[in-house]
Each structure stands twice: as structure tokens, then as C-alpha cells.
Amino acid sequence: MINQTYPNIEYFVIDGASSDNTVSIASSYLEKFNAISGRSRKIISEPDKGMYDALNKGARLAHGEIVGQINADDYYEPDAVQTMAELYERENYALAWGSINVITKNGNMIKHAKRGLLWTTSHWCHPAAFASRKILLEYPYPLINSHDDFDFATHVYLDGKKIMPIDKVISNFTFGGMSTQKSFREAKKRLDEIYGIYKKYGMSKFYYLHRLLFETVKYILT
């Protein structure tokens, strides 16, 4: 975040009262970050209900018009905030996301942001997503499971709000989180969680078949 080209950034580090070195590492950059004109950074460490509860908290604390939300192991491209801020000024989007550079032990690959003919997670890139603060407050993450981000995006999409995927790398994602674990149990869990979102919003069972195929291919190739 220190190297972002956009001048005015309010940055919150939301930590769930962890016992590791998260707070001390974040604190070591605090003075340098706050010394940059137009920048402010705050660190909050207190018990929460997980990642999406922390993201909801960040949206409530923010003062800007748009909010980007990224996890500790991931990082933005230097022009990420500027790209998404300028896009918002032109388009006044509710939700926008870019492509991500996926970092793996075997090299990097680009996951391209698209809308696609079907509304699926295949082209949804949460680490590269920015939303208007108003939308994040109106549609908070429901705190149901690890796919709360897709639940949020689906709700916004089906309510007819303006969404804008752009095929430009916005962030770098470290492969190896909850959504990448290889086991039949984890694949089945992901399938059930995402189908639960489709069902919740009255979407066709065809989406379940599409996701089943996606998880099968993912299980074989990873």
C-alpha cells in the first residue's frame, strides 16, 4: 500500500486479536505510511467472527466513497487504487473487480476478470474487487461460510446494481487458502456452499451442474 500511485488512501488493518506477529508487523510500517501526504493507516486488533466480519467492520469504519478489501497474504499492483478510483469516477459502479495474478509454487498465472455468459465464481476475483461503501453497508457479508464474498456479489448482481469486471491485473493472490485445498471433503463443501447461494437467490439448478464440473476439473488438475 505504501507504493500506491493514488494519493488519498485510508488504510485499516483489521486483526482478530491474533497471537502471531500480525500487529507488530503492521505497526512497523505505520509511521512510514502515515508520513505520506494524503495517507492514513489505523490498526485494530480485537476479537471478531472471522474474515468477513472484519471486512464488514472495515466498511463501517471507512470514510471514502469506494472500498477495496484484501487479505494479508495478497497485495495490490502499484496502480490498483488509482485504476479503480478513476473507474468509479467515470462509471459510478456498485461493484467492480479486475484480474488477479495467481502466485503458485510452480509459477504464476492470470485469472482474468469477466462477466461470462453464466454468473459463476469462475471469473469472480474477490482480492481484486472494489465496491462503493454505500453498497457494502447496504449488502453486508452474511457471515455464513467461506463464500460470503460470492454471496455478496451475487446479491448485488441480481438486484441489478452496476457491476464492472475489467481485464487488468489489480492484485496478486497467493494460492493456497481455503478455496484451494485439495480433498474430496473440501471440494464437496465448496460445491454445497456455492450451490446454497444459487438456491438462496432462486437461480437455476443448471448452475449446480456447472459448478460440479468445475470442481471435478479443479480436483483432477490441482
Where are these regions (language model features)?
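Conserved short acidic donor-positioning loop in nucleotide-sugar-dependent glycosyltransferases
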Residues: 1, 16-17, 49-50, 72
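Hydrophobic/aromatic residue at the end of a short beta strand that borders the catalytic acidic motif
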Residues: 51, 70, 75-80, 102, ...
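Conserved donor NDP-sugar-binding/catalytic core segment of glycosyltransferases
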Residues: 75, 79-110
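Conserved nucleotide-sugar donor-binding catalytic segment
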Residues: 114-189, 193
